[in-house]
């Protein structure tokens, strides 16, 4: 089965306003920049975006913030985006700041079909507000929900025509688990190779 499409605009054609998206990458590494550019061109809005970070002003998710296409961010680090800061302080953007390890596990849980889990991270802080608390082995833990997305956009090093992917170096941080947590995953690859080439190296 050939899962390759002509370009990023075709790949994202079924993404609509109001959907929840996961976008891979760690810092500025492994970001699906062509998919993000296509979303900017399409002009859809009211998006909920799940990403480790919010990009910078002129790259990554920063481009979608500039065009006011994001309604809510679920993220762990947002410190290098002045437009993000401006929108949050002006009450124009909803934000759910999640500890990085918790965000990673929420995404992994969503992809594995696990609806919720308990973690001690965040107990006794604002992170725990409104969440169920239980004690395990004398340690208080809060319940966190698994995360899913309507679509996930990832960036891979290599991919084949069947959709198998290999991620390289730091790009392996969030891309593979996000690929599992999206109902539909769209991957842009640096190199497209014939089926059977990747063999046992496949990550997803």
Regions found by a protein language model. Give the residues of each.
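ATP/nucleoside-binding phosphotransfer catalytic cores, i.e., glycine-rich phosphate-binding loops
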Residues: 177-202
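ATP/pyrophosphate-binding catalytic subdomain of soluble kinases
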Residues: 91, 96-169
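Conserved small/polar residues in nucleotide/adenosyl-binding loops
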Residues: 152, 202-204
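Conserved acidic residues
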Residues: 71, 148-150, 183
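Fold-independent oxyanion-binding glycine-rich loops
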Residues: 8, 24-26, 52-54, 76-78, ...
């Amino acid at each position: 089965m050939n899962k390759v499409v002509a370009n990023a605009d075709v790949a994202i054609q079924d993404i609509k306003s109001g959907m929840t998206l996961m976008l891979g990458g760690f810092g500025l590494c492994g970001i699906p920049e062509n998919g993000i550019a296509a979303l900017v061109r399409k002009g859809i809005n009211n998006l909920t975006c799940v990403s480790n970070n919010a990009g910078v002003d002129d790259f990554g998710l920063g481009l979608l913030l500039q065009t006011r296409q994001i309604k809510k961010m679920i993220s762990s680090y947002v410190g290098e985006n002045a437009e993000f800061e401006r929108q949050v302080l002006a009450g124009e953007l909803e934000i759910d700041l999640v500890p990085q390890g918790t965000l990673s596990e929420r995404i992994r849980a969503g992809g594995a079909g696990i609806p919720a889990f308990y973690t001690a991270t965040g107990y006794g802080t604002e992170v725990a507000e409104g969440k169920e608390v239980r004690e395990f082995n004398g340690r208080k833990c809060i319940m966190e929900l698994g995360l899913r997305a309507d679509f996930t956009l990832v960036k891979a090093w290599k991919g084949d025509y069947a959709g198998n992917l290999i991620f390289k170096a730091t790009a392996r941080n969030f891309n593979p688990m996000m690929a599992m947590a999206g109902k539909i995953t769209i991957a842009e690859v640096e190199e497209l190779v014939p089926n059977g080439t990747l063999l046992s190296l496949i990550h997803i």
